[in-house]
Design a protein with these regions (language model features):
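Adenine nucleotide-associated cytosolic modules
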Residues: 1-164
Length: 164
């Protein structure tokens, strides 16, 4: 809500909708132009991925823990050649220990950097009619080494979300 207010102060001619409801597979996202995932738990990420794919929405996902962060733009619902989140990070039946921010800690500047990268990609998605989307790549930021790597992602042809 605060972000909506601040953005509206800067530009009163824009329309921003926020969603403060708990997200589940029945959530209605069809009226949103872009979906931003800033969550820190896998189940939410899988749900957002599924909803974005089914509703043909661009999903701009950011994650961070300790001194590392990652950014990905997912467009599997808009282009069948692109992978989705679950192609790259498949669900497993085995319960593996997951490190989250609360347990592992996080450097504040890392979240700021990844968030800024997400916003930058969102602006390009909305404002530029001809631009080379970064969909299909995973960007890995290492705050300790001060490096950014770009990895080309491959679609899983047996993915239960986007290869059905």
């Amino acid at each position: 809500e605060n972000l909506v207010k601040e953005c509206s102060k800067i530009n009163p001619n824009i329309s921003i909708k926020s969603n403060n409801k708990k997200l589940d597979q029945s959530s209605d996202i069809k009226n949103f132009d872009l979906i931003f995932d800033c969550s820190d738990n896998p189940e939410t990420k899988y749900t957002i991925n599924l909803l974005s794919h089914l509703n043909k929405k661009t999903l701009i996902s950011g994650s961070a823990v300790q001194m590392e962060g990652q950014l990905a733009i997912w467009k599997s619902g808009l282009n069948t050649d692109y992978p989705c989140y679950e192609c790259v990070f498949p669900k497993t039946k085995e319960v593996a220990p997951i490190t989250n921010c609360r347990e592992a800690g996080i450097m504040g500047p890392i979240t700021g950097l990844i968030g800024s990268m997400q916003v930058n990609e969102g602006i390009k998605e909305i404002a530029l009619t001809t631009y080379d989307s970064r969909a299909g790549y995973l960007f890995l930021y290492d705050g300790l080494a001060q490096s950014l790597d770009k990895i080309k992602l491959i679609k899983n042809r047996k993915c239960p979300v986007c290869s059905i």
